[in-house]
Structure formats: C-alpha cells, structure tokens
Amino acid sequence: MPHLAELVANARAAIEDAQDVAALDLVRVEYLGKKGHLTLQMSSLRDLPVEERPAAGAVINQVKQEVQEALNIRKEKLETDLLNFRLAAEKIDVSLPGRRMENGGLHPVNRTIERIETFFGELGFSIESGPEIEDDYHNFDALNIPAHHPARADHDTFWFDAKRLLRTQTSGVQVRTMHSQQPPIRVIAPGRVYRNDYDQTHTPMFHQVEGLIIDRDISFTSLKGTLHDFLTNFFEEDLQVRFRPSYFPFTEPSAEVDVMGKNGKWLEVLGCGMVHPNVLHNVGLDPEIYSGFAFGMGVERLTMLRYGVTDLRAFFENDLRFLKQFK
C-alpha cells in the first residue's frame, strides 16, 4: 500500500512542523478525524478482495495508532515547552519585598458612633436599636407630638402612607424601651434617620444618637453634668459649654447645647431636656414618681466639628482620598 506510506510520511512531517497545540490539533483532524486521510483508507477496503481485507485493515489500524502516538508525543513536548517558557517569564524573585497589604479603616461616622457608645457604655447605658420604617405613634404621638401639632411641620418627613414613615429621629427606640422596661432606664439609640433635606449641611439620610435616663430624683443638674463630661471627653479638651433655653415637644424644660469654638464663636452640638410628663404618661409611668432626661445629637455634625470637615456630603461620596485621612 504505497499510498498509505506516503500519507504516514506526510502526517509525521506535519506533526513535527506543528508549533503549538492548536496547530497540532488541526493535523489530528486532517489525518484521524471523521473525514481524515487515514480514516478514509478504511472505506477503501471494500475495493479489495475479501481475503485481503483483514490484513489490510490491520495495517491501516497499526498506522493510525502510530500516528496517534506521534501526536501524543508532540503534544506533550509542546505543552512542556510552553510550561517552561511561562515559568521562566513569570518567575518571582522571592528576595524582593512583598506587596504591602492595604490597611482599611473605620468610616469617620462609624468612628464617632463608636466613640459615643464607648463613653456612655462606661456610664452604664445600654445600646438599643429599632426599626427605620416607623409608625406615627412611636415617631410622633408618644413623644407629645399629636396630629396637627405644629412641630410636625418642622419634620420634612418621608411618608409611606398615613401611618408609616421613615423615622425622623431615633426617639421611637426610647419609646419602645420605656414600654418594655421598668425604671431605672439608661439607654442610647444610635441609628440612621431620614428627612427631606439636602445641602452643604443636610442630607436626606444621616445618623443620630439619642439618649435617655428614667429614674427617681433625676434632675437637670444630672443632665448638665453628663453632657459636659461627654463633650469634654469627645473633643479631648476642657471646653466652655453653655445651655441655651429652647423648645422640644418631648422635653420640658428644653435646651440647646453649645461649645466655644477655636474661632471664639459658639457652635451648636446637641439638644436636650427633661422628659416631658406627657411622654411619661404615654408610656405608663407616673411623672410624680419618675423623672428623666433625654438628649439627641447628630453624628455627622459632631464628626464635622471633631475633624474640621466643612461639607457634610463628603461623608457619603466614598472618595478614598477623603476617607484615607481617617485611618
């Protein structure tokens, strides 16, 4: 079968000429595929006398096996050469210093919340949380802000329907705590709150921490001492602090708390007051027996003052150049 010998010689030459696995696979298909040259030799057996077919078929199968072995050997060599090339090209000098691991850090708002929680935790306050989708009872009614109360107009509220809203303050957590626990109560409620406002000093979502103490014989003096110590600890300096008379529906008397800035001007930092008797009535506590104080602070506001940030929106823009300053 001289034609068969020529095919084998051509196949071996094509195998040796293949420079990569893809080219080698094309050679395999050309000679051993369904329509390959050697495969088609099997169909030519029908032209031989019956007595010659077994011997001729055995020769063709032997040749196909030899070509397949040559393909396997060439493929193994090509893969080995490729691996050696990659190892040489991609080798690592282990004596070089490794890549420095990029250290992350807490977001400045989270750092402030953690600092507040640590201070009040050392005073025996527990940390409570509540739903951000609130009902009007816990957000308004229980806090001495009934329907049509003018104070409701001060809250640019995101309403879902007539009864459900995105909470405008974390005071609802305090209401739930007073319903579920008996005095003495010491609790702070950090969390996200929502109001429809957006400018350099306001965002639609921001963070608050509100605090509450309910017990016997709680006085405004207790409130002043607690907040003065907190502000001194938070800003890490002996600040000049003043309490200005103010109005909140849920406290009486009420006050705004200011600190003296480095520029000689007063800066408002939080609001506070003695818990209003109506609020105590609403949660089933007798104001003749129990009293308490409450306070609330904007976390972003305190963070801006502590770190000298002038634009509140920078906290929410995820600019790494800004955030890396707080590591």
Curated annotation (Swiss-Prot):
One GO cellular component term noted in the UniProt record for this chain: cytoplasm
Reaction(s) catalysed by this chain's protein: tRNA(Phe) + L-phenylalanine + ATP = L-phenylalanyl-tRNA(Phe) + AMP + diphosphate + H(+)
InterPro entries associated with the record: aa-tRNA-synth_II, aa-tRNA-synth_II/BPL/LPL, Phe-tRNA-synth_IIc_asu, Phe-tRNA_ligase_II_N, Phe_tRNA_ligase_alpha1_bac, Phenylalanyl-tRNA_Synthase, tRNA-bd_arm
UniProt subunit comment: Tetramer of two alpha and two beta subunits.
Name of protein: Phenylalanine--tRNA ligase alpha subunit
Disulfide bridge partners, by residue number: none
Keyword Magnesium among UniProt keywords: yes
Compartment annotation: Cytoplasm
GO BP term, example: phenylalanyl-tRNA aminoacylation
Listed cofactors: Mg(2+)
SUPFAM superfamilies linked: Class II aaRS and biotin synthetases, tRNA-binding arm
UniProt record similarity statement: Belongs to the class-II aminoacyl-tRNA synthetase family. Phe-tRNA synthetase alpha subunit type 1 subfamily.
Organism (species): Photorhabdus laumondii subsp. laumondii (strain DSM 15139 / CIP 105565 / TT01) (Photorhabdus luminescens subsp. laumondii)
Coiled coil: none
EC nos: 6.1.1.20
Cofactor note: Binds 2 magnesium ions per tetramer.
First-level EC class: ligase
Gene giving rise to this polypeptide: pheS
Molecular function terms from GO: ATP binding; magnesium ion binding; phenylalanine-tRNA ligase activity; tRNA binding
UniProt keyword list: Aminoacyl-tRNA synthetase, ATP-binding, Cytoplasm, Ligase, Magnesium, Metal-binding, Nucleotide-binding, Protein biosynthesis
Annotated Mg(2+) binding sites: 252
Highest rank taxon of the organism: Bacteria
Lineage, top ranks: Bacteria, Pseudomonadati, Pseudomonadota, Gammaproteobacteria, Enterobacterales
